[in-house]
């Protein structure tokens, strides 16, 4: 049995940044930082937040990364811990999720989540 983690997001019509730009931003920041010896998910999140703030200052952003680990090679036994909750206006606020490209090591998959919250009341 194969397990796939897809890129699913809520309706992105109200996103302050188009889906394609979000995907490009995540890929570029990840590409720049993944090869560095001091790579951490906190560094990745910081780079994504910096890019988001350059695109639009009318929103506050929340970025999370979920790393899915295969507990035993060759099995479909995965470990995932990620919780998210929000109270927002569906007309102004939303989220986008994106799976980072898998490397040769298929025992791990990382998911980036970006949340935007309108600063206006």
Swiss-Prot record:
Keywords: Cell projection, Cytoplasm
Keyword Nuclease included in the entry's annotation: no
Keyword Cytoplasm attached: yes
Protein name, UniProt field: Topoisomerase I damage affected protein 2
Location relative to the cell: Cytoplasm; Cell projection
Transmembrane regions: none
One CC-aspect GO term: Aim21-Tda2 complex
One Pfam family matching this protein: Tctex-1
An annotated GO BP: negative regulation of actin filament polymerization
Protein origin, superkingdom: Eukaryota
GO molecular function, one term: actin filament binding
Gene: TDA2
Family statement drawn from the similarity comment of this UniProt entry: Belongs to the TDA2 family.
